[in-house]
């Protein structure tokens, strides 16, 4: 019987200081799909391993096929590990966001690239290899034919997500993941994906694998997996969808099912501000939601339009206040210095963000991800450094590194981020009265300094 070993090359040495570590659900889905078709499978999650340990585990599994997951921050480690294991298998396969966008960039080492969703493709690749036939009749793959890169027709996306088996979580080091979070936050959290695809077209967002077609699992199917995760000893769920609240009817169905089953599992999620009204927020809280995160990104409608966010500042304000009124903790993400911004729009965002009743906020500089409209507009600028995406140790810094020519200097934007954090935490700890005495002069002075900076 043919054997497949799947590898997630997210190495421990690069991420010892990382607060957030999640198991590779995508490979978990592929492993479960292979098992369902009778294929022998192993999964080596390198998150808590050294490179030497990872190589040893893969070799011990004695696979016919090795399949890698790769993304923007993993290309270098993926290629290095694949080169080490080239002679330990008959076939090397890779998939994920970056291979889907740039299959040719992987085919000097890999034999086959999976384009898009991988469950059916990887199963069919294994079956073809076992039969000794080629891959030209498969949809959604790329390979070299006489030295030339060949891409087959796109594969149809999985429409019925309930038809997929749950990820094979037995391959993950669940105890290590639980202890990682218990030591840092006092609770253990595990991700769960309830939908695929996003119908929006934000300027900075890349969707190479799941695309724009939104597909979702049924409420009962979702909560069945919540029960499975609870049985593994986790006490919190991270709904890892791009926007968990996109379909209000389904969302409320999930909430009702969670309440009905009395699982005592808390959870958190990402949301869009235009989907969060008071009724939704209240039902989410009653169903165990503790925290919701919004990608607000800017405090001006002009910049939101540049980003193609299809939201307004007023919608963002209402969503935050609706969530807080329901008893939810609220986090928000903002970008400073977006192409087309000026000093006033940056300061407007700083004022808006620091004035919201948030529990958590994050500011980043614009970082152009391959496959996005933002990337296409900025990649020709002289100071754009694509290689930074391929160096894992740089990823902790990438959100605060200016990767392209801009009307703002990196130092000026970092000053704005520091100013925003001081204003935000100053208002939280000093209160309105205390901050009005100390904070107003600070804001005026730092506004002036910011405008003078280049």
How does the language model describe each region?
Residues 13-14, 102, 146, 248-249, ...:
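Flexible glycine/acidic-rich beta-alpha junction loops that bind and position SAM and/or redox cofactors
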Residues 104-108, 280, 340-354:
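Catalytic cores of alpha/beta
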Residues 2-19:
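Short glycine-rich His-centered loop
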Residues 10-12, 138, 144-194:
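N-terminal [4Fe-4S]-dependent radical SAM core
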Residues 22, 167-333, 351:
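Radical SAM [4Fe-4S] cluster-binding motif and immediate context
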Residues 2-6, 35-36, 40, 51, ...:
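Radical SAM enzyme core and accessory elements
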Residues 2, 20, 26, 30-160, ...:
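Glycine-rich beta-alpha loop elements in corrinoid/cobalamin-binding modules
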């Amino acid at each position: 019987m043919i054997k497949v070993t799947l590898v997630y090359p997210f190495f421990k040495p690069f991420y010892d200081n990382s607060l957030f570590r999640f198991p590779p659900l995508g490979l978990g889905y592929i492993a479960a799909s292979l098992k369902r078709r009778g294929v022998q499978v192993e999964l080596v999650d390198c998150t808590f391993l050294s490179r030497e340990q990872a190589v040893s585990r893969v070799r011990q599994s004695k696979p016919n096929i090795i399949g890698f997951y790769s993304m923007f921050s993993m290309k270098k480690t993926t290629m290095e590990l694949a080169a080490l294991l080239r002679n330990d298998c008959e076939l090397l396969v890779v998939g994920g966001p970056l291979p889907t966008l740039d299959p040719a960039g992987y085919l000097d080492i890999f034999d086959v690239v999976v384009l898009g969703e991988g469950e059916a493709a990887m199963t069919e690749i294994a079956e073809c290899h076992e039969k000794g036939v080629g891959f030209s009749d498969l949809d959604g793959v790329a390979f070299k034919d006489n030295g030339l890169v060949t891409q087959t027709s796109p594969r149809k996306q999985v429409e019925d997500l309930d038809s997929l088996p749950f990820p094979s979580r037995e391959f993950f080091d669940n105890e290590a993941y639980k202890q990682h979070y218990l030591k840092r936050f006092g609770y253990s959290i595990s991700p769960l994906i309830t939908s695929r695809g996003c119908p929006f077209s934000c300027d900075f967002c890349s969707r190479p694998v799941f695309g724009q077609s939104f597909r979702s699992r049924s409420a009962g199917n979702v909560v069945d997996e919540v029960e499975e995760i609870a049985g593994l000893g986790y006490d919190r769920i991270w709904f890892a969808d791009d926007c968990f609240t996109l379909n209000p009817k389904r969302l409320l169905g999930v909430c009702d099912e969670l309440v009905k089953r009395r699982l005592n599992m808390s959870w958190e999620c990402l949301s869009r501000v235009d989907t969060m009204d008071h009724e939704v927020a209240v039902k989410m809280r009653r169903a165990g939601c503790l925290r919701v995160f919004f990608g607000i990104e800017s405090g001006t409608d002009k910049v939101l339009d540049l980003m193609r966010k299809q939201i307004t500042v007023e919608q963002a304000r209402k969503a935050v206040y609706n969530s807080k009124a329901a008893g939810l903790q609220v986090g928000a993400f903002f970008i400073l210095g977006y192409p087309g911004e000026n000093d006033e729009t940056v300061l407007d965002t700083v004022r808006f963000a620091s004035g919201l009743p948030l529990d958590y906020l994050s500011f980043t500089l614009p970082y152009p991800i391959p496959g996005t409209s933002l990337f296409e507009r900025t990649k020709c600028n002289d100071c754009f450094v694509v290689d930074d995406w391929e160096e894992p140790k740089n990823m902790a810094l990438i959100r605060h590194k200016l990767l392209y020519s801009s009307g703002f200097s990196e130092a000026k934007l970092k000053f704005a981020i520091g100013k925003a954090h001081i204003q935000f935490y100053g208002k939280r700890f000093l209160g309105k009265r205390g901050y009005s005495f100390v904070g107003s002069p600070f804001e005026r002075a730092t506004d002036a300094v910011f405008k003078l900076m280049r």
